[in-house]
């Protein structure tokens, strides 16, 4: 959620920036009307409170003089009722302002390139050279099915399309990838491993920005409307990414600045309805309703967040480098960024069968956008005031897409797969996967 003070002091500039950079039209007149109403009610509330306090003191003085105070008591009582009504009205207006702000995307950092979609993203760097094959390249679906390791028909039978059953050595390779990633991040990059719920409440989804805007992209235990408020029927949602529960660990917390940065990692399944993705990537593991990911989250002091973004992105890059997978680093333009991001790098891995780079990690600095929604703050020792932390998140990596990249880049002419060296300890020493 963007800073409400920005709207109070620079409304027209903010509205213009949102329009130009985000394609978002802010209802300026509604904001102005609500802000005027809020200011009037704020003044009224403060005035009534001051008058009520003054009258209350008069009651004490009159009582000490032995005077009849019944009229004063009635006056203070009426003033109290009026004050309560004003407070209720003020709370209502503030709730309306918050509701409006929840739909407003984050403002991009100045260095983010202006653009309408992914065709205007900026390539920053490349690592590794795509392998030159002397045989006809197969895609991961053909390779996985020939190895009896990917069973998409079983996924359809058990659930629906965009689900898969992994078996045998490919299931183990998938597990090896996630274990390797976790070990790297915890042992070399300084992250604390967390094991978090896969079902979360709606406060958690509001905190990281999935709700209210992206409810249709989630799987819910109950419809978002008409929910039963009873404790036994509380509505939960399956997590679309571990970013959601892990980042919310600091919700409603005041963190000692000396303990920052906080670095967390988690390996979880992720669940996405893929609303709006009909017809896209219908073949294989690229776009699934259920997939696994190793997520990295950092909670940092505001002045450290841009430096932290470079560090976090480097941690994701290290996974690809150790696996020997060619990739490129891309700075997303304003039209391709996520709703809550101020700056995002995508890492795109080379897929030989598609003869192109495909996203395998997205690393974002959210500034204080999520922290404001979560009321996540920090305070230095000796300071009376708190300030909002900055939050960052990144895939380190998407496990299924990494499996795709390993299968395609390490395939052999006979359909076998050479196991990358760093994964062999997790595979019981297996060097080549055969049918």
Swiss-Prot record:
One GO cellular component, as annotated: cytoplasm
**Swiss-Prot/TrEMBL keywords:** Aminoacyl-tRNA synthetase, ATP-binding, Cytoplasm, Ligase, Nucleotide-binding, Protein biosynthesis
Q: What is its EC number?
A: 6.1.1.11
Which amino acids does the record list as binding L-serine? 241-243, 295, 395
Whether Cytoplasm counts among this entry's keywords is: yes
One function term, GO molecular function aspect: serine-tRNA ligase activity
Q: Where does the record place it? A: Cytoplasm
Does the keyword field hold Nucleotide-binding?
A: yes
In this chain, ATP is annotated as bound at 272-274, 359-362
Give the pathway listed in the UniProt entry for this protein: Aminoacyl-tRNA biosynthesis; selenocysteinyl-tRNA(Sec) biosynthesis; L-seryl-tRNA(Sec) from L-serine and tRNA(Sec): step 1/1
Note what the entry says on domains: Consists of two distinct domains, a catalytic core and a N-terminal extension that is involved in tRNA binding.
What does the sequence similarity comment in the record state about its family?
Belongs to the class-II aminoacyl-tRNA synthetase family. Type-1 seryl-tRNA synthetase subfamily.
Assembly behavior:
Homodimer. The tRNA molecule binds across the dimer.
Q: Name the job this protein performs.
A: Catalyzes the attachment of serine to tRNA(Ser). Is also able to aminoacylate tRNA(Sec) with serine, to form the misacylated tRNA L-seryl-tRNA(Sec), which will be further converted into selenocysteinyl-tRNA(Sec).
Q: What is this protein called?
A: Serine--tRNA ligase
Q: To which species is this protein native?
A: Actinobacillus pleuropneumoniae serotype 5b (strain L20)
Q: Which gene encodes it?
A: serS
